[in-house]
Every structure is written in structure tokens, then in C-alpha cells.
Amino acid sequence: MEHVDSPLYLGLMSGTSADGIDAALVRFADDTHRRCELVAGTTVAWEPQLRETLVALGQGAETVAIDALGQLDAQVGLAFAAAANQLIGDSGVERRQIRAIGSHGQTIRHRPNASPAFTWQIGDASRIAEHTGITTVADFRRRDVAAGGQGAPLMPAFHLAMLGAGDEDRAVLNLGGIGNLTLIPRDGAVRGFDTGPANALLDSWCQRHHGTPFDADGAFAASGRVDAALLQALLADPWFALPPPKSTGREQFHLDWAVQAMGNARLDAADVQATLLELTAASVADALLRLQPTTRRVLVCGGGVRNPVLLARLAARLPGAMVESSARYGLDPDYLEAMGFAWLAAELLAGRAANLPSVTGAAGPRLLGAIYPA
């Protein structure tokens, strides 16, 4: 990409799986921010005990004292700052070239349907700015919630900017801890919504029964068989039938939710893994066929893109669409969300609204994020 002297932006993201902090250095082609290049990226693993605490908090499994939560907010902020500093050091770029950091933080609770609604991400942005020396933009979701929106998903605006449909109806599928779809028709408004559990349940079940943090290449799931009764019980959750806009998280779709659906059935662990994988494929395909049946291309990003068994099941359920990695269009699937938060920071500093009311249900376009100066 040209314009090598244009400023860089650094995006930081840790999703519902809390499997690591993704950091991405991004350069935009011009001030429209409609073309971008990944200059460098890295993923920094969470310290195991800290990750355990974050996962437990994220699924609503425990409460925490205010003092402990304040310290956790600081710890997460320091971890994000360390990830940014590691990427800067590894990439060799000069700090002065980076105009801003966009930090998503770590979601510990997402309750868009509560009264009043709220969403909560921790990771003290003041500490990120202090320990990197770079202006930091954070707290992207709460303004959309304040405007009556779900506060999620936020990536559809970025997907539209980078992967606009052109001459076909297409979708962008992020397979993180939770799955979410962006529907980009040739004509008409973009829509986006969460589809339900993805890696979060698969990883948790694999950790419980294999002692490994994820199912490498989907091998554990491939060794089992889908249990039709369990799949039906899981899909019977009323959330799946809700129309968009909708969003969810570990608070709703956690491992105890799946175990409860099993009842007294004595199932092989591999069969459960196969069924959880099929749940992800089915929930995505059902939503896509219901809401944009003319989709011809599904561009996949997030950790799930490395699960060939999951991609094969998606392709089988979507015979009319090409299912492929976003890498085909020059956007690294491992860092697409981190790149998206770099983009959100750039959009705020440019004074442009970055939510899509057609996606989140907000009352209108809003500037997203708060600025923490260096």
C-alpha cells in the first residue's frame, strides 16, 4: 500500500473466549479509512490465573468485591499496554508514528436487555495511555447502549468499509467466543447480529475433557458423532428465535447452560464436542438462510477459521454460498477484530459516527469511544 508516511493506528482486542490479547498495527490508505493494511500483528496470552478470573466473571459465575474489581481493571489495562508495547518493539516502528490506540478492553458483563441496559468492559485506558505514551481510545460500546442500541456487534461498520458487497450479496462471519454475522446485500441496509455460541463452548468443553485450551483442527469434534436430541435441546433456547438486533455473551451461553441441556443423558465427551460444533454451524446457517438466503459468499474471520471441521459443516449447511477466509481479500482473519478497533479509534478522531443503527438498534448514528490523551 502507498502512503507509507501516513500515521499508524494500533488496535487491541480480547474477546469472550479470553484466549489472548490480539494487537494489530494498521495503516489506512487515506483519510476515508476505507482501505487498510496490517503492518504487524501479535497475540499475547493471558496469565493463566488472570484468564481464569476473567472467564468466570464473564459468564456470571461469581461476584467480586469492589476492591478486587478495581485491581482487576488495572491489571487488564497493564496487560493491554504490555501487548501494545510488545508489538511496537517487535515491529520496529517508531512510537511517534502511531496516532492512537483503539482498545476494546475485556467484557465482563453484557446486558443490553436489562432495565436499564448496560455493557461493561474493563482494562483501564488511562494506564494504557500512561504506559505506552500513546493517545488511547476506549469504551466503544456504551454510547450505542445509551442510545437504545445493543452495543454489539460493532464490527459490521468496519466490514462494510473494507468488504463492501459490490455485485453480490455477501456475509462476514466472525467466529470468536460468540459468533456474529454481518449481512452486506448488494442493495439495502447492512445488518449484523450475534448468532450464538462459537469457540467459547467448544474451548470450555475441550479444556474440561482434554486439558487443552482449544480443539486443534477440530480433531476432538471429528472423533465424535452429533447427538440429535442434544442439538435439538440446545437450539430450543428462545434466544435463537429472537429477531435482530440481538447480541449475547458468556453470561447466557456458558458450559453449565450446555450441561443443563444434556439432562440425565450419558453422552460420550467427543459426541458432545461434535454436537457443540454442529450447534455453531446450525445457528449461523439458520440465521443466514432466514435473513439473507441469496448470500453467495461468506467470509470467515476469528479463531474458528482455523477449525476445518467447523468450516466444512458450515459449507455443508450453506450449499449456495462459498465459505472462505477473509484472507482471500487481504484481511488477516486472526487480526480482523483488532484491526476493527484501530479503525474505530481512527473514525472517532476523524469525527465520524461508527455505529450502524440498522445493526444495533440505536436511535441514530453516534460517535463511539472516549479519548485518553497520551
Swiss-Prot record:
Pathway it works in: Amino-sugar metabolism; 1,6-anhydro-N-acetylmuramate degradation; Cell wall biogenesis; peptidoglycan recycling
Membrane-traversing stretches: none
One GO BP: peptidoglycan turnover
Keyword annotations from UniProtKB, A to Z: ATP-binding, Carbohydrate metabolism, Kinase, Nucleotide-binding, Transferase
Gene3D superfamilies in the cross-refs: 3.30.420.40
UniProt cross-references to InterPro entries, sorted A to Z: Anhydro_N_Ac-Mur_kinase, ATPase_NBD
Keyword field contains Hydrolase: no
Pfam families: AnmK (PF03702)
EC assignment: 2.7.1.170
Superkingdom per UniProt: Bacteria
Sequence similarity: Belongs to the anhydro-N-acetylmuramic acid kinase family.
Function of the molecule: Catalyzes the specific phosphorylation of 1,6-anhydro-N-acetylmuramic acid (anhMurNAc) with the simultaneous cleavage of the 1,6-anhydro ring, generating MurNAc-6-P. Is required for the utilization of anhMurNAc either imported from the medium or derived from its own cell wall murein, and thus plays a role in cell wall recycling.
Protein name: Anhydro-N-acetylmuramic acid kinase
Organism from which the protein derives: Xanthomonas axonopodis pv. citri (strain 306)
